[in-house]
């Protein structure tokens, strides 16, 4: 429907940022009508996020900056939500300590989203090089950043380089596995290894799905509708970080099995 209109995927992403950022304002109010509107806005923002990906595939308008902007959009949505919760709770309880929980939740979310994105992209890479084309090594990202001209795109790619660096530092056994496989097979990893990796990786997806947009927002919506928004901070900081730790330990153990 949007093909031929001149609307680009990045335009859709920018619209989703503004729609999602409004959710924090809706959740600030201790009012069921506002809260339901906030839930609907967040769902709509996520639909827009899906639309920009579909539009990119249909039009062939794809770029690394578009992917970075896409991830940045989700961070803005949730940052606005954490701030909205903090303002609401500080108003209700007369203390600003909830902003500390907002910061901890935001940092937790960034790390969780970072690692989750890495694992899911890696899984696609082991399906095929085409489906996993977005999976890049740190060296590839650094080389791309170095050759870019100064400007806003280079700045976004600088952030992406740090984003990738965190992924690499957090997954040492995974990096050893990739180095080992590429040393043996180059880019032509045998199909039996790909299938075996996907089979084991798929078992971890039930944990990883808890850290995705759908996984976390289902819990968030229930908490928002009950009015006990402070509970989401605890869920984000305690429960989801425990889930992340379990996933990372299991994933590293899985990768170690391919080093033999």
Task: Show where each model-derived region lies.
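Membrane-embedded alpha-helical segments that form the functional core of polytopic membrane enzymes
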Residues: 6-65, 82, 98-108, 233
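Juxtamembrane helix-capping/reentrant segments at transmembrane boundaries
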Residues: 56, 60-74, 132-136
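Alpha-helical transmembrane segments of multipass membrane proteins
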Residues: 23, 78, 108-113, 242-247
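Membrane-spanning helices that line or support transport/gating and their immediate boundary helices
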Residues: 50, 54, 58, 114-126
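C-terminal membrane-associated helical module and adjoining short loops/tails
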Residues: 121-260
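Select subsegments of transmembrane alpha-helices in polytopic membrane proteins
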Residues: 9-14, 70-78, 205-214
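Alpha-helical transmembrane segments
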Residues: 86, 90-123
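Hydrophobic, membrane-inserted alpha-helices
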Residues: 18-24, 80-84, 215-223
């Amino acid at each position: 429907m949007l093909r031929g209109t001149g609307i680009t995927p990045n335009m859709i992403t920018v619209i989703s940022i503004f729609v999602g950022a409004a959710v924090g304002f809706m959740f600030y109010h201790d009012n069921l009508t506002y809260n339901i509107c906030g839930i609907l806005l967040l769902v709509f923002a996520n639909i827009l996020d899906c639309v920009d990906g579909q539009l990119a595939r249909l039009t062939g308008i794809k770029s690394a900056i578009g992917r970075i902007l896409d991830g940045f959009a989700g961070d803005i949505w949730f940052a606005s939500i954490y701030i909205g919760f903090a303002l609401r709770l500080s108003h209700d309880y007369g203390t600003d300590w909830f902003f500390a929980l907002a910061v901890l939740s935001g940092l937790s979310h960034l790390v969780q989203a970072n690692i989750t994105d890495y694992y899911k992209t890696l899984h696609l890479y082991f399906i095929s090089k085409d489906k996993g084309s977005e999976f890049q090594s740190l060296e590839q990202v650094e080389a791309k950043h170095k050759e870019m001209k100064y400007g806003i795109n280079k700045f976004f790619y600088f952030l992406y380089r740090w984003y990738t660096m965190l992924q690499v530092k957090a997954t040492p056994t995974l990096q050893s596995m990739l180095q080992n496989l590429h040393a043996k097979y180059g880019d032509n990893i045998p199909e039996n290894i790909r299938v075996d990796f996907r089979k084991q990786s798929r078992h971890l997806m039930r944990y990883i799905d808890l850290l995705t947009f759908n996984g976390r927002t289902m819990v968030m919506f229930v908490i928002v509708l009950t009015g006990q928004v402070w509970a989401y901070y605890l869920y984000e900081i305690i429960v989801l970080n425990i889930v992340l730790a379990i996933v990372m330990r299991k994933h590293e153990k899985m990768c170690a099995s391919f080093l033999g």
